[in-house]
From Swiss-Prot:
InterPro entries: LuxS_sf, Metalloenz_LuxS/M16, S-ribosylhomocysteinase. Keywords: Autoinducer synthesis, Iron, Lyase, Metal-binding, Quorum sensing. GO terms for biological process: quorum sensing. One of its GO terms (molecular function) is S-ribosylhomocysteine lyase activity. PANTHER family: S-RIBOSYLHOMOCYSTEINE LYASE. The gene is luxS. Fe cation binds at H57, H61, C124. It comes from the Bacteria. Pfam families: LuxS. This is S-ribosylhomocysteine lyase. Binds 1 Fe cation per subunit. Homodimer.
Amino acid sequence: MAEKMNVESFNLDHTKVKAPFVRLAGTKVGVHGDEIYKYDVRFKQPNKEHMEMPALHSLEHLMAELARNHTDKLVDISPMGCQTGFYMSFINHNDYDDALEILATTLTDVLAADSVPACNEVQCGWAASHSLEGAKELAEEFLAKRSEWKNVFGE
């Protein structure tokens, strides 16, 4: 691989990982001691498959809204531009297993959802690009492989 880059994920050998997985991608400590924990939540195998944008977009909305019902430590859930996963960030919450539980509970909530939150032109920048059914399929697939989430390299 090339020289070390500033972006953590650019230093990850994407040919060596095996999706699905959840890995701690980085930590940051603020000037007042607060700590941010960023997780790579990988739904699809890099460079082999990806999430279709309407499903990914709806899953982002659903997870961003529903996860906050289970924790006040969530900072953000952001989709990856490569459409293979999300970044999930917490503040002052360094419990990996609990982060997995929050994710699992949130995805279970997605399966029960009857609408996509903020799926309108006032609250969303591309309201026409959503798929509740697609989001549910992604959540169901990821949950079905929960036993693999801790195994980043398929060992």
